[in-house]
Design a protein with these regions (language model features):
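Bacterial N-terminal signal peptides that target proteins for export
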Residues: 1-9
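Glycine/proline-rich, flexible active-site/cofactor-binding loop segments
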Residues: 3, 19-20
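Bacterial N-terminal signal peptides
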Residues: 9-19
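Rhodanese-like catalytic fold shared by cysteine-dependent sulfurtransferases
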Residues: 21-41, 45-160
Length: 160
């Protein structure tokens, strides 16, 4: 009987730990309206081509959230801490102001980690990112820009 009680207590403790982790993750998510009300900044962690306006997939979202910055996770390996701090200063991000990231989970996690390491304290995810096509913005004349993958394929001698 004592063993059953111990197992029950362990199961409850694990359940509470999972629930608190889930609650913490939920608390770290903001929707676009909440971010705007808090005067926060959205950051797109996807490759720049998608931020510029190229769709991620056939009939997929095209562009970026209004006033979003682009900090592609692909840049992180090439950015020193000093360069990232300069980027943060250039964009006037404050350590105590909310920042909401969007992109795929691994890109968001990579950027979140580096921004927190750089001292930003309120790093969340943007829960409704790329869900309202009418809200998305594109760089002017983005379609005249050469898509990076096309250029890479051309340089590799592949058919383009």
């Amino acid at each position: 009987m004592k063993r059953v009680s111990q197992m029950t207590a362990l199961a409850l403790a694990l359940g509470l730990a999972c629930a608190s982790t889930w609650a913490a993750d939920m608390a770290q998510a903001l929707n676009f309206k909440q971010l705007a009300q808090k005067q926060g900044t959205a950051i797109d962690t996807r490759p720049s081509a998608f931020y510029n306006g190229w769709p991620q997939s056939l009939n997929g979202p095209s562009g970026h959230e209004p006033s979003a910055l682009n900090l592609s996770a692909r840049w992180l390996d090439n950015m020193s801490d000093e360069q990232l701090n300069a980027w943060i200063q250039q964009h006037q991000l404050k350590s105590d102001a909310p920042v909401a990231l969007y992109g795929n989970d691994s890109d968001v996690q990579a950027v979140k980690s580096r921004l927190q390491k750089a001292g930003l304290q309120q790093v969340a995810t943007l829960s409704d990112a790329l869900q309202d096509p009418a809200r998305l913005q594109r760089l002017p004349h983005f379609e005249q820009l050469v898509y990076p993958q096309w250029l890479h394929d051309l340089q590799q001698g592949k058919e383009v």
